[in-house]
């Protein structure tokens, strides 16, 4: 097997505690653009066609492993935090195959690495028959990073850590990203790393000297964008990483035919899919498994999570959709809320301050204002008046109601579930409907109006004079009576 034909295995180091995050959540599980940081590393490894991916866990191992369950990776636990060299060895020894693959080392807190960068790194490693290839970058000020020191011929000589560097070495701009491609000998050499240092830890960087002692080829592959190897060790760096990913994601969507009216304010998670000629107004947030079809407009400051929006849908500003399916040509909002289980068929109108949950509205249904529609199926072309409430909860259980097609529900009506309203029925405004309504019937369920002539004059005349003086309009009105 030639060097170029070797399979690729990946070890992802994700065992650190991340104390600078000051969080109960393991560092690598902090989300960036819709994925935990470690999931970005897994995604990149999969894009390379890796044969085997092992994630090394330690702090919060159960949480990390649960978060990645079903992703196709395997896990190895680092029992004690003994440094990167020990963590790598734990992961390498857990690989299914030994001694026949190149091994890529990634970190669970570097979510910005592009698969194309890693492909180029791997290609360089194999083209030069290298034993160890280090991914490096340059910064005007590389404070905090280990520096790459080269000999007079430009070959990598050693890596010096920040705390051990001389002033001259600290001036070096090229730094070690911590990402490596190693040949199949790496696990064997890693067993020879010692912890003879002030921290008493095993450092993966010591592999460089061990390879050099073997006379092996060691290279550095320098990338042009140092942002790619930006680690997120605290909340500030997490926000910086999120901003980089947001720009990447937004740019990709714009290049694919999506209009973002103010990209700096729009957040689209990596798991979202958008069609062509979609328009996103300022402040829009799209999350989870949201799928948006061609020609959809989403208004300013709307939040859409795990929802499907079919062709031509209009979501007006300040609307919140979660777990909803909105059919072609429907419009929602402004200030509407569609909760999980909502299905709007074609050309449905949901207006301002309407809330739905576990509701299916057939084609042409209109609910224009101030309504709650929960646990209900509503037939085609039904009109839901302002203030309509489906009273679906009895204090213990939710109950389902059915409203037929072509029904007219007057304003401020309450349907006390479970109810069945037949096709073409009328519900009078202000009714509290507590019995089923047959097809084509009119239901009126409200108290009879009483009108008491002269009541206001008697009421105010009996009021204390001090109260009447606070109402200047009242004296004039009483004089006219």
Swiss-Prot record:
Metabolic or biological pathway: Nucleotide-sugar biosynthesis; UDP-N-acetyl-alpha-D-glucosamine biosynthesis; N-acetyl-alpha-D-glucosamine 1-phosphate from alpha-D-glucosamine 6-phosphate (route II): step 2/2; Nucleotide-sugar biosynthesis; UDP-N-acetyl-alpha-D-glucosamine biosynthesis; UDP-N-acetyl-alpha-D-glucosamine from N-acetyl-alpha-D-glucosamine 1-phosphate: step 1/1; Bacterial outer membrane biogenesis; LPS lipid A biosynthesis
Linker: region residues: 236-256
Pfam family, one: NTP_transf_3
Disulfide bond sites: none
Binding site for acetyl-CoA: 386, 411, 429, 446
InterPro entries named among the record's database cross-references: Bifunctional_GlmU, GlmU-like, GlmU_C_LbH, MobA-like_NTP_Trfase, Nucleotide-diphossugar_trans, Trimer_LpxA-like_sf
Cofactor note text: Binds 1 Mg(2+) ion per subunit.
Enzyme Commission number(s): 2.7.7.23, 2.3.1.157
Keywords carried by this UniProt record: Acyltransferase, Cell shape, Cell wall biogenesis/degradation, Cytoplasm, Magnesium, Metal-binding, Multifunctional enzyme, Nucleotidyltransferase, Peptidoglycan synthesis, Repeat, Transferase
Active-site residue list: 369
Signal peptide as annotated in the record: none
Binding site for UDP-N-acetyl-alpha-D-glucosamine: 13-16, 27, 78, 83-84, 107-109, 146, 161, 176, 233, 339, 357, 372, 383
Keyword Magnesium: yes
UniProt-annotated location(s): Cytoplasm
Necessary cofactors: Mg(2+)
Entry GO terms, CC: cytoplasm; membrane
PANTHER family hit by this protein: BIFUNCTIONAL PROTEIN GLMU, NUCLEOTIDYL TRANSFERASE
Subunit structure: Homotrimer.
Job of this protein: Catalyzes the last two sequential reactions in the de novo biosynthetic pathway for UDP-N-acetylglucosamine (UDP-GlcNAc). The C-terminal domain catalyzes the transfer of acetyl group from acetyl coenzyme A to glucosamine-1-phosphate (GlcN-1-P) to produce N-acetylglucosamine-1-phosphate (GlcNAc-1-P), which is converted into UDP-GlcNAc by the transfer of uridine 5-monophosphate (from uridine 5-triphosphate), a reaction catalyzed by the N-terminal domain.
Protein name: Bifunctional protein GlmU
Annotated organism of origin: Deinococcus geothermalis (strain DSM 11300 / CIP 105573 / AG-3a)
Gene name in the database record: glmU
């Amino acid at each position: 097997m030639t060097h170029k034909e070797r399979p690729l295995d990946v070890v992802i180091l994700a065992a650190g505690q991340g104390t600078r995050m000051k969080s109960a959540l393991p560092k690598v599980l902090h989300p960036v653009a819709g994925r935990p940081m470690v999931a970005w590393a897994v995604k990149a490894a999969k894009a390379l066609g890796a044969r085997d991916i092992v994630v090394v866990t330690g702090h919060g191992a159960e949480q990390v492993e649960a978060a990645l369950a079903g992703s196709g990776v395997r896990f190895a636990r680092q029992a004690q935090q003994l440094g990167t060299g020990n963590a790598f060895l734990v992961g390498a020894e857990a690989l299914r195959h030994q001694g026949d693959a190149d091994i890529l080392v990634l970190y669970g807190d570097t979510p910005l690495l592009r698969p194309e960068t890693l492909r180029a790194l791997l290609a360089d490693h194999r083209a030069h028959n290298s034993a160890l290839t280090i991914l490096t970058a340059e910064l005007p000020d590389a404070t905090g990073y280990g520096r790459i020191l080269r000999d007079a011929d430009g070959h990598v000589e050693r890596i010096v850590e920040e705390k051990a560097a001389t002033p001259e070495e600290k001036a070096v701009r090229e730094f070690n990203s911590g990402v490596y491609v190693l040949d199949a000998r790496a696990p064997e050499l890693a067993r020879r790393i010692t912890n003879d240092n002030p921290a008493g830890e095993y450092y993966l960087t010591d592999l460089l000297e061990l390879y050099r002692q073997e006379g092996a080829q060691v290279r550095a592959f320098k990338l042009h964008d140092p942002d790619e190897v930006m680690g997120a060790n605290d909340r500030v760096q997490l926000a910086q990483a999120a901003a980089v990913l947001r720009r990447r994601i937004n740019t990709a969507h714009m290049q694919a035919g999506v209009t973002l009216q103010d990209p700096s304010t729009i957040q689209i998670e990596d798991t979202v899919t958008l069609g062509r000629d979609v328009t996103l107004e300022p402040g829009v947030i799209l999350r989870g498994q949201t799928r948006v079809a061609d020609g959809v407009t989403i208004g300013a400051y709307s939040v859409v999570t795990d929802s499907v929006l079919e062709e031509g849908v209009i979501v007006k500003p300040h609307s919140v959709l979660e777990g909803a399916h909105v059919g072609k040509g429907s419009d929602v909002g402004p200030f509407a809320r569609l909760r999980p289980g909502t299905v709007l068929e074609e050309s449905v109108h949901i207006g301002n301050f309407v809330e739905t949950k576990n509701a299916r509205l057939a084609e042409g249904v209109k609910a224009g204002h101030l309504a709650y529609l929960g646990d209900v199926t509503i037939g085609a072309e039904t009109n839901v008046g302002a203030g309509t409430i489906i009273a679906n909860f009895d204090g213990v259980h939710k109950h389902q109601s059915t409203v037929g097609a072509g029904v007219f529900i007057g304003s401020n009506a309450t349907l006390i579930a479970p109810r069945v309203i037949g096709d073409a029925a009328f519900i009078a405004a202000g009714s509290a409907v507590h019995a089923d309504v047959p097809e084509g019937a009119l239901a009126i369920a409200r108290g009879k109006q009483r009108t008491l002539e002269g009541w206001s004059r008697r009421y105010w005349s009996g009021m204390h004079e001090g109260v009447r003086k606070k109402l200047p309009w009242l004296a004039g009105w009483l004089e006219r009576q």
